[in-house]
A protein has these predicted regions:
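Active-site-proximal, structured, solvent-exposed surfaces of multi-pass membrane proteins
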Residues: 12, 35
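Extracellular beta-strand/beta-solenoid scaffold signature
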Residues: 28-30, 51-58, 73-81, 102-119, ...
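Ser/Thr- (and often Asn-) enriched beta-sheet segments in non-cytosolic proteins
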Residues: 21, 33, 40, 47-49, ...
Length: 345
């Protein structure tokens, strides 16, 4: 297949078909093919260096493979997993692979480059990995029951952690910072579709909690069309600050529960265009530059127990839409913050 052909452009790949631990801290100018299942490949701190093309570690249709302590840089994709289940990636570094800039990625389609991509994978764990300085850090496509824990995905020129059609997964305790992008439309480091964590194309029933998201385009970006929305998410206990655009953007979604997060110094704390049956509860929103929350065409949504310091919460109908059936209770407002519902029923 195409990925395999790209591997062969480099030196002959290292083939791993059984449990393997490399000598410590080696340097290899070749790629790796995992050619078996039920095995552990421990790089023991060794580095695999590419020439700007191909895949560093390739796994296709395997099960129960563990990859640990590997450093992979200089490839088009640091690691690519296509099909299979029960993978573990732990304590690897996929930094310094393909990166580009200066175009909008607002359509939220997968980017076939970057740190690590998993496609069609079930019941797997990524823990304690680093994937910085790529176009995207971690991308998970068409998968389910994934656990993404304690990773660092920062200073990517697109997305830190990206879910596309991925369901019933947990994204916990990750550090996701400075994921930003430039584009001709908006300028240098203007967001341009970049975000810390992205959920799109029906990435439903996921849990997003205890993550640190600072200085990203959006902190968390769920969207961004009716057909691509992600529903029944729980987003909680995240620390979000200094987002270029929105701390959380969640558009066209249903039944998302967003609670106990802190938002500080974002352009908008949260933006919920066309979201319905939203529960936004017990969040603290401070010093947003434009609005603490803007929720266009809000319907059947509940705002309760939030602390709002500075900018207003605005619910409104737009473009002939409806704003109706929303409720507010026990929200605390400081520094002239208001809850504005002009035009809502």
């Amino acid at each position: 297949m195409k990925l395999f052909a790209l591997l062969l452009v480099l030196a002959a790949p290292m083939r791993i078909a059984k449990d393997t631990t490399l000598p410590p801290n080696g340097v290899y100018h070749q790629a790796v093919i995992i050619a078996g299942s039920n095995l552990t490949f421990d790089c023991n701190g060794s580095t695999f260096i590419g020439e700007g093309i191909g895949v560093g570690i390739l796994i296709q249709n395997r099960t129960s493979v563990t990859i640990r302590n590997c450093k992979v840089r200089g490839f088009d994709v640091g690691a690519y997993v296509l099909g299979g289940k029960n993978f573990v990636f732990e304590r690897n570094d996929f930094s310094g692979n393909y990166v580009d800039d200066n175009s909008a990625i607002e359509d939220l389609k997968p980017i076939p480059h970057g740190g690590i991509i998993l496609n069609g994978v079930q019941n797997s764990r990524l823990q304690g990995n680093t994937s910085n300085g790529n176009v995207a850090g971690i991308q998970i496509l068409n998968s389910s029951k994934m656990r993404v824990l304690q990773n660092t995905t920062s200073r990517n020129r697109g997305w830190g952690i990206y879910l596309f059609g991925t369901t019933s997964s947990t994204i916990y305790t990750n550090t996701v910072e400075y994921n930003n992008r430039s584009c001709p439309q908006w300028g240098v480091d203007a967001g341009c579709g970049a975000a810390g964590i992205v959920l799109t194309q029906g990435s439903n029933r996921n849990l997003i909690g205890w993550n640190t998201l600072n200085y990203d385009g959006d902190g968390i970006y769920q969207g961004n069309t009716p057909g691509a929305a992600s529903n029944d998410l729980e987003i909680f206990n995240n620390t979000i600050a200094h987002s270029v655009a929105n701390g959380i953007e969640a558009t066209f979604s249903l039944r998302n529960y967003i609670h106990d997060n802190t938002f500080t110094d974002d352009n908008y704390g949260a933006w919920f265009g066309y979201a319905q049956q939203l529960r936004f509860e017990n969040n603290a929103i401070r010093n947003s530059h434009v609005k603490s929350v803007e929720h266009d065409n809000a319907q059947s949504s509940r705002y309760a127990g939030n602390l709002i310091d500075g900018a207003d919460i605005l619910l409104q109908p737009v473009q002939g839409g409806s704003c109706a059936g929303n409720s507010f209770s026990n929200n605390t407002r400081f520094n002239n913050a208001q809850i504005v519902t002009t035009g809502c029923q």
